[in-house]
Structures are given as C-alpha cells and as structure tokens.
Curated annotation (Swiss-Prot):
Reaction catalysis annotation: tRNA(Asx) + L-aspartate + ATP = L-aspartyl-tRNA(Asx) + AMP + diphosphate
Encoding gene per record: aspS
Single GO MF descriptor: nucleic acid binding
Record region (Aspartate): 206-209
GO BP term, pick one: aspartyl-tRNA aminoacylation
Cellular localization per UniProt: Cytoplasm
UniProt cross-references to InterPro entries, sorted A to Z: Aa-tRNA-synt_II, aa-tRNA-synth_II, aa-tRNA-synth_II/BPL/LPL, Asp-tRNA-ligase_1, Asp-tRNA-ligase_1_N, Asp/Asn-tRNA-synth_IIb, AspRS_core, GAD-like_sf
Species assigned in the record: Aquifex aeolicus (strain VF5)
CDD domains: AspRS_core (cd00777), EcAspRS_like_N (cd04317)
This protein's UniProt keywords: Aminoacyl-tRNA synthetase, ATP-binding, Cytoplasm, Ligase, Nucleotide-binding, Protein biosynthesis
Family stated for the protein in its record: Belongs to the class-II aminoacyl-tRNA synthetase family. Type 1 subfamily.
Function text: Aspartyl-tRNA synthetase with relaxed tRNA specificity since it is able to aspartylate not only its cognate tRNA(Asp) but also tRNA(Asn). Reaction proceeds in two steps: L-aspartate is first activated by ATP to form Asp-AMP and then transferred to the acceptor end of tRNA(Asp/Asn).
Protein name: Aspartate--tRNA(Asp/Asn) ligase
Matching Pfam families: GAD (PF02938), tRNA-synt_2 (PF00152), tRNA_anti-codon (PF01336)
Amino acid sequence: MLTEYGDFKRTKYCGEVSEEDIGKEVKLAGWVHRKRHHGGVIFIDLRDREGIVQVVVEEKTNPEAYEVADKLKSEYVIGVVGKVRKRPEGTENPKLKTGYVEVVADRILVFNTSEALPFPVEEETHVSEETKLKYRYIDLRRESMKNNLIFRHRVYQITRNFFTKEGFIEIETPFLTKSTPEGARDFLVPSRLHPGKFYALPQSPQLFKQILMIAGFDRYFQIVKCFRDEDLRADRQPEFTQIDYEMSFVSEEEVMDVAERLIATLFKELLGVELKTPFERISYREAMEKYGTDKPDRRFGLELIELTDIFKNTAFKVFKSVVEAGGIIKAINFKGSNLSRKEIDELTKFVQSLGAKGLAWIKVEKDKLTSPIVKFFTEEETQKLLERTKAEPGDVILFSADKKEMVYKILGNLRLHLGKKYKLIDESKWDVFWIVDFPLMEWDEEEERFVSLHHPFTMPREENIPKLKEALEEEDLEKKKEIVHSVRARAYDMVLNGEEIGGGSIRIHRRDIQEVVFKLLGIGEVEAQEKFGFLLEALKYGAPPHGGLAFGLDRVVALMLGLDSIRDTIAFPKTQRGICPLTGAPDYVDPKQLKELHIKVLE
C-alpha cells in the first residue's frame, strides 16, 4: 500500500486551492484530517500547513482510488492527483477558505501510515499540558498552534526589516561566555579542555552589545536566545528570546522612539491596530503609589488610595503601630461590589498567601458602616476616610497597613486579582506606556546591601552622579540609604496591558562611574576585576555614550495573540519545572562523558 515519494511533485498547498483552479489538475500532499463515507463516495479532508481542502473519491468512476481511500485512517500521509471542481450547490463550507471547491481524485498515493493518536488534532483537546508537550509534533498540527508559530515568524520578518531600514547591523554574540551572575543563576557548561573551568550561557547579550558600541558599531540589533536558571514562576521559560538593540550617541528619547515605532509597526502590520505614538510616560513612583506595581494594568480602575495622614493619630492600634514604625496605610475602594462576608473571607485568604497578616475592610451601607474596625475610628477619621475614598452605599473599602513595600505587594496583587475575578478588565483595549524615573538602586533587607533595579551598567541621571560619590563616602547607613534612594536611573520599561514587554537604559560609558556603582553594590575591586574586568578594560579606550533596550519576544507575541501562556508561542517549550517532556531533558549522561569533563556527581 505504501508508495515512495519518488517523482511525485506537489503543485499547490491544500489551503491554497481556489475557484481560480477549477478545471485544472493539482497535485496535493498532506495528512488525512477526516474521512467520511457517503454511499459509494468517500470524502477526505486533506490538511497541510496552509489549511484543509475536500477531496472526493467516487467508486463508480475511479474504483482503484476508491479502494486506496477506503483503507485510509486519520493522519495517514498521502498524495492526491485530481481535478478541481466547484462544490455542488448547498454543500459549500464558508468556514473554510477552500469551502467553495473540491478536488476529485484520480490517484491517491500513501506515503506513510499513522497509529492511533494519543489525542485528536482538534482545537478542543482535553489532555494535560504534559501530554501535549510530550507529543508536541501532534499538538503543533492544530490550526491555532500552527498559526501562532507563523505569526511569530512574521514578527521576526517585520523586526529584521524594520531594523535594517533604520540602519542597524545584525550581529551575533557568543553563547559560550563568562559567568557574571546578577540576579538569576547562570546555566553552566563545563570545559573539557580546561578542567575545573566553566562557560556560562548568557542571560542577555548586555556586555557584548556594549563592547560592540565601543568597537564603533553604533547601531546593533539581534534576535537572540537568552538563558536563566531560575525557579520558574507562572509563565517563564529557562530559555527565551529577546529582540535586542543598542545605539551610540543617543539620549533616552531616541532609544525609546525606535522601540515605539517598532511596536507600532508590528501592531499595524499584524493586527491592523494603530497605536498612537509617542506612548504615555508615567514615573515609577506614580505607578507604585497608584497601582502598587511598576507594570500596572490600567484597563480598569481600583487605584490605591493614600490614607496614612488620616490615621496618623488614630486610636486603632494596628494602624497606629504601623504609622509609628514608618509604614503606610492605603486602601482600595471596590465600588458597588456589595461583597458578601464569604467573598471577603476568600480575599483575606488571598492576601494572607502573599504575607499579609489579614485584611481590614469596611462595607458601606445606606445608613451604616459594617466593619470590625470602624468602632475604633473617631467621627472625623471616618468622615475623612469616606470623603477620600469617595465612598457610597454598596462600596467595600479594603485596607493594607504595613511597610511600604508590603502594602504595594498586597494591594497591587489584590487589585489585579479583583480585576480578573470580577471581570473588570477591558480586554478590547491596548494600553501601552512607559515607566520612567526609576531609582538606580534599592536596599535589600535580606542581603543587607544595595541592589540594582535594572542592572549595574545603568547610567544615573547626570545631576545625580555627584550623589554616588557622596554616598560612597557616607558612613551612616541610614543617611547613605537616603542619598542612594534619591538617585534616579536613566532607565525605561515598556508596559503593555499590565505586562512588562521591554526594558532598557542609557549605559555607563565612563570607567570611573562604573567603579563607583560597583562599590555601592558591594562589588569590591577584586570581584569587579574577576567578573567584569574585560568591560572595565574596554571602558578605558574611548567608549561612546550609548543605550539600548531588549523586548521579550515570546511575551510580545503572546500578548498580541491574546494567549494565556508564552508556551503557546514557542515550538518546543519546557514545563514549569524546566523539563522537556518530548526529549526527556534534562537527563543523566554517560559516566565516560563526566570523566572527560573532570566532573563527579555527588549523591
């Protein structure tokens, strides 16, 4: 029954057969999507990359082809030679782009058979994610998955064309490089030729693209794989793709302008959506104070309301102790929600899972306020609270009182949870904007040191540079924190519908400033030389002012397609545990290989 492909030459994709082909012979190849018997006639839905076309096999006119068709099963790989005709009236299928024509088979060739599939090639498949990834080659046969990857390919095409027209040069940077972990862990690759030494897979091409600027390639771009060995949160991958670019002799505005025009081009060409440029800019401080996060979803309300000043002298001990300890009090007014006690209890459990001690609340009713805490407030405090929150009957006010960082974490997450749970988000909207005016560093209580908000190569604002040296000389830790926290970075993040899709900065191009920043971050001279000596050396030889940005391509594609997970934009992704069910990676290796690498696995 099986035929070698031999001289068979496909003339058209199944999904491209049209009314223009009526009366013509076509040669098609693909998979049997579906087969139906209808009294001496067999109908085959033949599927390939471009779509499905109906093939008709008539026993009366072509018994040989009919005999072959009769033995076909789902997902057999076949070739069809036949003539295109118009479908009989009343049998058209407007859901298919080929739905007004069909191919009458003269000959059917079977190139390969298929066993019964672990799950059908249908859009609605009730199988686990693990099973889909194990049989990814079957999952990718589904229309939606195929379209996702074709869409991603178009993003690549448009991006490359855009940067080429803008005068950028595409340059590849190494995958085997030096370990310079900042934040996430590096994936390490042992060197056989240099026992005990390791390469690292890059978390980003950051240092190489800066060195390319020093080399004089003033406009570089790359679509590049990056790697992070981190605990995978909800929607992360250990290997991911960035659209990366860097420019010399530019300000923030010029780098941001390129980013805006790229995103606007992608939206216009792929979705037919006109994004208004320049995008709005909001400060880091405003984002945190209003939304509790530096990547807010602004497609719904529920902004955070500042209440610390109202309760600074309150008799309510919980609030009073927070204010005395330098904390803050904020609230969300969930307008018209009329939350039940059960719903409030569920929200309390949610915030407790984030580290909150509990959830204070007030239910505003027509003639009274229902709450376990309102009895502790003075009449003046209650009145000011109702005015500040613009409270009306039916509203429920939800409070958080703690250290500033914890309040932002609790209410920022609670706001998003309410938005999703109660369907407050306008899904038809595209809200894209910049977050700017980031602090350069913040104090990490656990590590007891300053950490970069972006990375250690971000340039501070020019007027803030003297403060870095001042902070370095300051011995009092609290004063040092105050000085450092007042330093603003020349950094910018692009946010789309509550997701950070890109981030960048103007970089440090002066060795003296870079050394001061390293010292403030607790990276001493010896460590700086060990990790970043090649960069410090390069900065001595005429480094131009430069800056750039990187977009998370997987995330951009997922958001544009309205997908819940970036996994659906990647051909062969890993699970949340960093496993590839298709290949079984990561896996044990032959002891001989380990011996060659001078590695011993300890139990």
